[in-house]
Amino acid sequence: MKVFVDTNVVMEMLDSRNEADLIGSIFDWLDNHEIKTYLSVGSFYTITYLSERLLHKQGLTRPQLTGKLRELLIGIIDEFQISSIGSKELLKGVSDEQFTDLEDSYQLQSASYADCDILITINTKDFKDCTDSQIKIYSPRLFFKEFIEE
């Protein structure tokens, strides 16, 4: 099994939102079972930007902010494989009329490029019309229920 994680799932955990504990349990399970887990390079850029804003809101300033951000991002790089797509996949994503949110289309293309079986996202409704894909779409709660919960 190969699992692709949408940006919103990582940010849910980093920002300690509603499903942070559940997502932490999923990440622990994936790690303990040595399941390859992927992020898109676009997600990494977005996580960098949003994490910097979060750290700033917590009162950190440079250079401490930059040091903490680097530490966080190195941890993410250690835990995830990074899927980077090229112009062919981007064009396919831009052209996919099943999506009204093109960023989600790029995420699906990144997951497909990495040969992932599963995509975990908080916004499953954004993927409801992607019938051409072999990738199964799960919310964190559904993934936990189907794979982890006894």
Say what each PLM segment does.
Residues 1-39, 57-64, 148-150:
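Short, well-structured N-terminal submotif of metal-dependent ribonuclease cores
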Residues 2, 109-150:
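Acidic, PIN/NYN-like endoribonuclease modules and their adjacent C-terminal/linker elements
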Residues 8-9, 42, 125, 142:
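Alpha-helix/helix-capping structural signal
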Residues 14-15, 51, 131:
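Short, flexible helix/strand-to-coil boundary loops that buttress conserved ligand/catalytic motifs
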Residues 23-28, 70-73, 107-108:
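Short amphipathic alpha-helical segments and helix-helix/interface helices
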Residues 53-85:
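Helix-adjacent hinge/juxtasegments
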Residues 78-124:
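Active-site neighborhoods of divalent-metal-dependent phosphate/nucleic-acid chemistry enzymes
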